[in-house]
Amino acid sequence: MTKQPEDWLDDVPGDDIEDEDDEIIWVSKSEIKRDAEELKRLGAELVDLGKNALDKIPLDTDLRDAIELAQRIKMEGRRRQLQLIGKMLRQRDVEPIRQALDKLKNRHNQQVVLFHKLEHLRDRLIVEGDDAVAEVLTLWPHADRQQLRSLIRNAKKEKEGNKPPKSARQIFQYLRELAENEG
């Protein structure tokens, strides 16, 4: 009986295991689970969105129907539906969905920052008076100086009389209208 040479397997035709182009990428089971869990969380975020926000996100009809169903389901059925949504997301390109969701979140954050700035400006208007009114008029030249002064005067009276800050709220609403009409 003859013994085969040790390198006999190297000469098999069509064997290109060591080809540099066919690099095998090994992914751990834990990493696959983490990715699946992340997609499930993305699905849960989509389920928590309202109808108007969902309209702004690029979803196909199957995924949209699954999300709308999950919004109606409670308890254990919801968990299973979230699992299904996660599975559906694994089969799709989720980058456009993530980008649209980030855009929605960013818009909300920008609105919160704007409201804080307007609240600060309102407080300055009440404390500083005409100096702050001049600043508002430089920001928004079409603002009504007389209306602002009247609201500031009423807000100061309410503050001195320990009354509810109705005029302060009106100042904030007026500033918000000015900011919205500008953009």
Swiss-Prot record:
Gene Ontology terms for molecular function: ribosome binding; rRNA binding
Keyword Cytoplasm among UniProt keywords: yes
GO cellular component, one term: cytosol
Compartments, as annotated in UniProt: Cytoplasm
Segments passing through the bilayer: none
Keywords: Cytoplasm, Ribosome biogenesis, RNA-binding, rRNA-binding
A biological process from GO: assembly of large subunit precursor of preribosome
Entry annotated with the keyword Cytoplasm: yes
InterPro entries, per the entry: DarP, DarP_sf
Matches recorded under Pfam families: DarP (PF04751)
Source organism superkingdom: Bacteria
Primary localization: cytoplasm
Similarity section: Belongs to the DarP family.
Described purpose of this protein according to its UniProt entry: Member of a network of 50S ribosomal subunit biogenesis factors which assembles along the 30S-50S interface, preventing incorrect 23S rRNA structures from forming. Promotes peptidyl transferase center (PTC) maturation.
NCBIfam families: PRK05255.1-1
Protein name from the UniProt record: Dual-action ribosomal maturation protein DarP
Organism in which the protein naturally occurs: Salmonella paratyphi A (strain AKU_12601)
